[in-house]
């Protein structure tokens, strides 16, 4: 099984798709969302789009049904994506950019009042998604969670943490003051109940989770394990960092979650989810969205091991190296030092993840390409881990 996410057409070539298509060990591909992006031709990550002949159509931010259909068509012109669809079966779920950035049930960060009805926009986006993507429609088009089984080896549950019942994210920006962060209020507000999967989907997860299968694999969009900013940021000169990062340096090295769009913004429901999946023999939680590679042990609030999280790098979207440059290796190292359950991270390379699933272990392979800015590239050395059944990573 391979899995991937975050394929941004103007950001770079889909070389990792080509490598997945060529990998004869892969029987199935999971795409965990951000299959496409909604921005205008000169928007996010488009700096090299003209040079690479990867300007999107339509050239404005997509809002209408025709817009979403045309954007899907733009992506499907890519020969590497065509090759992947022609050579491998794919199971897909959406994340936010199939609609617009940081979507929740009733709105989105990247949807303003002058862009019309969000409900209509969401309906247009999901209609185009079902028209273009390898997914069957059901009676309720907003319910895309579903499960697949492989003998008594795998129970694969594909989830929707994005669109169906997600409450609005807590806005961390409101807690910053000049040279101060309102930590106590933020941490108290973070603990308040918020839906992410929501009651209906959690009930379904509970009904499908049991110990009949050696491995329960959850394909979903966002990082689930707690993530804290690395301590090294406290010692970096601010002028070497992008301006939007400056205020976050106040959080570096502290046990303060910084990304409330992830499960970190929904800690109460995360505990409910962890309690449910304890009924499985052994859990792997797959994630996309972050554009970086991660592998972590997962523990509940009582420090009980519940599974292993594996986060996929982006196919082409910018990751840490595009923000931090040469500092990224040290930042990766500091991330591990500042997050006790984080085993390894890579914010430099783009690519995908392969899982070789056996009864007693799963071998996890992070596959990378040397560049997304040219169609001439090299396969990079693979980083691998072995996850033993029902055991944390050492």
Where are these regions (language model features)?
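Metal-dependent phosphoester/phosphodiester hydrolase catalytic core
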Residues: 1-394
């Amino acid at each position: 099984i391979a899995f991937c996410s975050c394929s941004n057409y103007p950001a770079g070539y889909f070389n990792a798709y080509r490598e997945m298509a060529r990998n004869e060990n892969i029987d199935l591909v999971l795409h965990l969302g951000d299959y496409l992006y909604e921005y205008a031709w000169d928007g996010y990550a488009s700096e090299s789009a003209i040079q690479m002949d990867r300007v999107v159509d339509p050239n404005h931010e997509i809002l209408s049904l025709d817009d979403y259909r045309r954007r899907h068509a733009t992506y499907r012109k890519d020969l590497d994506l065509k090759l992947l669809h022609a050579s491998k079966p794919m199971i897909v779920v959406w994340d936010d950019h199939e609609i617009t950035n940081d979507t929740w049930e009733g709105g989105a960060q990247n949807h303003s009042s002058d862009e019309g009805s969000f409900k209509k926009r969401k309906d247009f986006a999901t209609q185009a998604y079902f028209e273009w993507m390898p997914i069957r429609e059901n009676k309720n088009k907003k319910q895309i969670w579903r499960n697949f089984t492989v003998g008594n080896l795998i129970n694969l549950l594909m989830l929707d943490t994005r669109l169906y019942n997600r409450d609005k994210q807590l806005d961390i920006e409101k807690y910053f003051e000049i040279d101060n962060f309102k930590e106590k209020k933020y941490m108290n507000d973070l603990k308040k109940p918020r839906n992410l999967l929501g009651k209906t989907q959690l009930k379904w997860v509970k009904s499908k989770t049991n110990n009949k299968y050696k491995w329960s694999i959850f394909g979903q969009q966002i990082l689930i394990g707690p993530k804290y900013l690395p301590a090294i940021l406290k010692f970096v000169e601010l002028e070497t960092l992008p301006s939007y990062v400056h205020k976050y340096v106040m959080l570096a090295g502290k046990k303060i979650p910084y990304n409330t769009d992830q499960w970190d913004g929904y800690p109460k429901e995360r505990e409910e989810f962890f309690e449910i999946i304890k009924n499985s023999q052994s859990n792997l939680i797959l994630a996309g969205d972050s554009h970086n590679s991660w592998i972590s042990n997962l523990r509940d609030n009582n420090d009980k091991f519940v599974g292993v999280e594996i986060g996929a790098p982006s196919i082409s979207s910018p990751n840490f190296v595009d923000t931090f440059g040469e500092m990224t290796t040290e930042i990766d190292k500091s991330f591990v030092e500042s997050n006790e359950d984080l085993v390894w991270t890579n914010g430099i390379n783009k690519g995908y993840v392969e899982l070789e699933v056996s009864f007693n272990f799963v071998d996890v392979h992070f596959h990378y390409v040397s560049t997304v800015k040219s169609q001439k590239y090299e396969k990079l050395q693979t980083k691998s881990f072995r996850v033993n059944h029902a055991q944390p990573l050492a």
